[in-house]
Amino acid sequence: MKLGIIAFLVLIYGSFLYGQMSLTIEIDEFRNPKEGNILIAIFTDQLNFKNDISLKNWTVPKEKLIKGVFKETVKLPLGEYGIAILDDEDINGKMSYSFFGIPKEGYGFSDFNHSGFKKPMFSDFKFSVSDSTHIIRIKLRYL
């Protein structure tokens, strides 16, 4: 009986871990690396990105940066993803805009050098997690 339960748990646990890959996110060149928070969101498709429904999102206080660099590893199953980053300098949990609608805080996307004012499409910054280790370096943009 115990052997059956153990075998069942190993099967369930093994199925859960199968396909889990390591994704390391690296960000540096913060305008102010000491104050504020970093908001990270991982998206799986255009519809979820458009509706701001992330697979995973979290906030990291900049006090946790090491020498002004953010580096964190997450586990994800095989698939396509896109990462959006906000340098939340005023710690209000959202992008702050000027009177003219220009972002006041830094932002960035995975594998995408954003050069316009328009919000990108998911296809602009998506990438595939297809091997056991994947590193994404995100460049922040400040206007």
How would you describe each model-predicted region?
Residues 62-68, 129-130:
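Short proline/glycine- and polar residue-rich coil/turn motifs
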Residues 54-64:
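Solvent-exposed serine/threonine-rich low-complexity stretches and specific carbohydrate-binding patches
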Residues 87-89, 142:
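Surface-exposed loop/turn motifs at beta-strand-loop junctions within extracellular Ig-like
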Residues 70-76:
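Exposed aromatic-hydrophobic patches
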Residues 92:
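Acidic carboxylate motifs that coordinate Ca2+ or other divalent cations, activating on Asp/Glu
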